Structure formats: C-alpha cells, structure tokens
Amino acid sequence: MTEWSAPSVYLCIATFRRPDGLRKLLTHVERLTYRGTVEVIVVDNDGDDRAGAAIVEQIAPTFRLPLRCDVEPRSGHTYAYNHAFQHACRATPAPEYVAVLDDDEYPDPNWLTEMIRVAQVYNADIVGGPVFPVFDDPDHWLAKSGFYAPSRSATGPVSTIYGAGNMVIWRSVLAQYLDEPFHHAFAFTGGSDYDFFWRCRNDGRSFAWADDARVFETMPPSRTTVGYVLRRKFRNGTEATRLERKFLCSLAGAARRWCIGLGLLGLGIASLPLAVLRGRRAIVASLMRAARGAGRIAAEFDLHYEQYR
C-alpha cells in the first residue's frame, strides 16, 4: 500500500463453541501483511464453557498483535457482535476502521490490505469481499455442485454487500448506529447484517466491493448435506421477506413478495418431474427453489428458522 496510508483497524471476531476454528482464524490473522496498526477483540458468546476465551488466553501472550477477549453471556450472535462493535468504537486511541471476520473463516494474507485499499480508493463507508468455501471433502458431489459458489462483484462501488462475514466499515459510520447496529430480532435467525446494510443504504452510506480481498469458510461434513442446503435456502427466503416487509411496506411490495414466494415454490415443485430425469443435482436445485419460496411464504406469517439457536 505504498500510495495510500495504512489507517488503524480494529478487528472484531464473535465466537461460539468453535475453539478449533477460532485458533485457525487467529493463526491466519497473525499472518496478515497489513502494515498499519491492527488490534483484535474476540467476543465469546458462550457464557458457560468459554472455550473461545480459553483459546485467546493461551494465544495472547505470544500473539503478534494486541489481542483481548470479552465474554458476552446473552445468547445470540447479534449480542456478541454489538459488544465487539461498542468496544471498538470506544477504544482509545480510536481506530479509523472496524473489520469483521467469523470464527469459521480465515483470511488470505493480503485480505486486510486489499479491503482498506478499496475503502480508500473508492471513499466507501462499507466494504465487502468474497467468502470462498473450503470443504473437508472437496470430492463430495455437493461440493462440486456450484450451490456454494460465493457472491461476487467487480471491485468498485456497489449498491450493497452480501454479508458481514468479510467486512470493513468506517468507525465513524458504525458509531452512529452504536445503540444496536445488529438488531436483536435477528439474533438466532440471521439477517441482522442485511438489515444493517439496508438501514445504512437508506441513510446514504456508500458501499464498495473488494473482489481480491479473499476470505475462506470451512465447510465440515455437516454442511455438505441436502438438508443443510435446503434449510439454508429456506432461511434465505425468510430473511428476504422479513426485510422487504420492514423496508418496502406497501400494497405493491406485499403483492410482489407473494408473487415471488408462490412463484418460487410453484416453479420448484413443477420442475421436479423433469429434474428426476436429469439427476440428483437438478433435483436438489428444484428443491432449493421451492425451499426459498416456502421460506418467503412462511415469513409472511412470522414463521422463521432459528439456525443459530
């Protein structure tokens, strides 16, 4: 980053009963090539076992970067991340940026350098990047299916980003939402990041995408099942409807939501007979479409899948 400054960054990590994942993540964080000041806070969301806190206690004395751990006993990832955000925004000296990674991820060494470069070049308030799946069994047919392909965009300004698992935000922007940046209504269902981005967009915040700022997500066998894929699609459907009901609350918006939900469900079911002839990938693709539609319809009746409880 010879042409740009290297502003200070506070890296926020929430963890819940993934000590091995947290250890791997912190190992890769220590390998970051970013030349600016980086401080790391881990918030353990398990008030009982505190396995994440134990990992930080082991690692911190020899860790290359300033590293601390707090425990957030209130259940739900929104509480953990909001705890981390509040600490980052009130830190002294104040960091210029706040970054976010999840405890089942690990970054490329150049990740933070690229995120900050894009933030500065495009003067963006919030920057996102791709998250690539890494499978325990890369030869599993689901791993090869394309169903797990990451969201991508060209590097540069975008209307929004796709999730907080790979994110950098101006601290001064985050501080304006500090009462509850991630709303606790989404604590167990997911979607709090999309809700936050929608609010930011409505407030005129700018977004950019850093397609070379790569993060990798570990995918154990429990995530390479048809059931997992369908539950995830159902949850995606409920998230979409919840947010549209909140931010696009009109008769036209309601009609659009129902058309999309019923259309996806109907198309998914109608395509099954042909999919049976084409093989298991086609069958699962049809079921995924139907699951997303079912999730959209379920959310109209305030029914949600609590993936994180």
Language-model regions: role of each:
Residues 72-90:
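Glycine-rich, basic loop-to-helix element that forms the pyrophosphate-binding segment
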Residues 93-106:
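Short beta-strand-to-loop acidic/aromatic patch adjacent to the donor-nucleotide binding site
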Residues 1-31:
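N-proximal low-complexity "stem/linker" segments adjacent to membrane-targeting elements
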Residues 187-198:
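Acidic donor-binding loop at a coil-to-helix junction in glycosyltransferase catalytic cores
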Residues 30-70:
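Acidic donor-binding segment of Leloir-type glycosyltransferases
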Residues 130, 143-160:
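Short, flexible, basic/aromatic active-site loop/helix in glycosyltransferases
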Residues 110-141:
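Conserved donor NDP-sugar-binding/catalytic core segment of glycosyltransferases
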Residues 231-235, 249-309:
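Non-catalytic, C-terminal membrane-associated alpha-helical segments of glycosyltransferases
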